[in-house]
């Protein structure tokens, strides 16, 4: 796996299995990059250029690594974590262009050197889970499928990827998603494990029609939608044998499928839980949780491994406060026997 920075533990001693050309990195997830203008085309390398091509999972030039190794310490001006996009077939990273209207470039990727010219960030959701991909150090210049909007005839085989200021075009709205069976089911290069890791849904008894999701960098509840990848979580049990809570229940992390971030303890009672980049190789109790005994109908409390008195709480999601709604914050609270504190973590 890539080494991932986390709380000063930067994992630089864990170079990627793939470096340079060739089809290495078999255990790393690879991603497809596509835009809303035509989801049947993916970003590819062709003759040294970055273009769109008809989606083909067997074309390794359409497979990209999303390298998050610098994400903990390098952010854009909005606080979004930096990543590099490294082509599986060539080992080259997508590099900033000369400016607006110019095609993005390709450059050799040095995993030991934080070169800002190959670092990108994703914006907030700009509709249906699409996001802008923009320069780390100039978030006003975004990936743009050149003339890929309807007014210019749409995307075609060979459409160039350039940078352009935000014009609200479908050709500027992107998703970076894992390839299918050949990729880890998770959505980030700092995912907990290789292989097809099953994802889980997290919901509370107050309203089982809502599931825990990531939105705008926060953990909240949203109407349940299996197609919304942000509602998919990996329950990583890798430390469960060695770390238990005071009642003996095993510890786990909850890692978002899309962002690769783990839910982190809040600052205290009443504060929202947080998200941080997940480093599977580093034992960090601040991202570890346990489940209580059954508190009725198979529901359980989800609580801090090192303070089981603070539980997941759908803030003001009890009947007295109007119930769960779209956007209800997940905070920590002492046990009050509320339905908004009783949770299930079940497979999708």
Curated annotation (Swiss-Prot):
Keywords from the named record: Lectin
One MF annotation (Gene Ontology) recorded for this entry: carbohydrate binding
All copies of domain Ricin B-type lectin, residue ranges: 199-345
Induction annotation: Induced by abscisic acid (ABA) and salt stress in roots.
InterPro entries for this protein: Ricin_B-like_lectin_EULS3-like, Ricin_B-like_lectins
Tissues where the protein occurs: Expressed in roots and shoots.
Renumbered residue ranges of the record's region Disordered: 1-26
Keyword Nuclease: no
PANTHER family: RICIN B-LIKE LECTIN EULS3, RICIN B-LIKE LECTIN R40C1
Function: Lectin which binds carbohydrates in vitro. Interacts through its lectin domain with glycan structures containing specific motifs.
Domains as described in the record: The ricin B-type lectin domain binds glycan structures.
Protein's UniProt name: Ricin B-like lectin R40C1
Originating gene: R40C1
């Amino acid at each position: 796996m890539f080494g991932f920075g986390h709380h000063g533990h930067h994992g630089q001693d864990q170079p990627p299995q793939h470096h340079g050309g060739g089809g290495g990195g078999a255990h790393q997830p690879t991603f497809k990059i596509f835009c809303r203008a035509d989801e049947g085309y993916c970003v590819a390398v062709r003759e040294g250029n970055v273009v769109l091509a008809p989606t083909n999972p067997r074309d390794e030039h359409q497979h990209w690594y999303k390298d998050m190794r610098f994400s903990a310490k390098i952010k854009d001006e909005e606080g979004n974590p930096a990543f590099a996009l490294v082509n599986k077939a060539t080992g080259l990273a997508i590099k900033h262009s000369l400016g607006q209207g110019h095609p993005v470039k390709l450059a050799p990727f040095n995993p030991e050197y934080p070169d800002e010219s190959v670092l990108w960030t994703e914006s907030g959701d700009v509709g249906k889970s699409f996001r802008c991909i923009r320069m780390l150090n100039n978030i006003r210049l975004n990936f743009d499928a050149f003339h890929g909007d309807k007014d210019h005839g749409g995307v075609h085989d060979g459409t160039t990827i350039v940078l352009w200021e935000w014009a609200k075009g479908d050709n500027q709205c992107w998703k970076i998603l894992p390839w299918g069976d050949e990729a880890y089911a998770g959505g980030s290069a700092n995912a907990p494990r290789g292989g097809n890791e099953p994802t889980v849904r997290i919901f509370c008894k107050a309203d089982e029609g809502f599931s825990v999701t990531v939105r705008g960098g926060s953990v909240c509840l949203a109407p349940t939608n299996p197609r919304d990848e942000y509602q998919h979580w990996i329950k990583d049990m890798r430390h469960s044998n060695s770390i238990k809570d005071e009642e003996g229940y095993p510890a786990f992390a909850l890692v978002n499928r899309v962002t690769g971030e783990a839910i982190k303890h809040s600052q205290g009672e009443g504060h929202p839980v947080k998200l941080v980049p997940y480093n599977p190789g580093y034992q960090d109790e601040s991202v570890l949780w346990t489940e209580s005994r059954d508190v009725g109908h198979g529901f359980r409390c989800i609580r801090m491994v090192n303070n089981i008195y603070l539980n997941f709480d759908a803030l003001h999601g009890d009947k007295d406060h109007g119930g769960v709604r779209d956007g209800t914050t997940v905070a920590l609270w002492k046990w009050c026997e509320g339905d908004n504190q009783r949770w299930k973590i079940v497979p999708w």
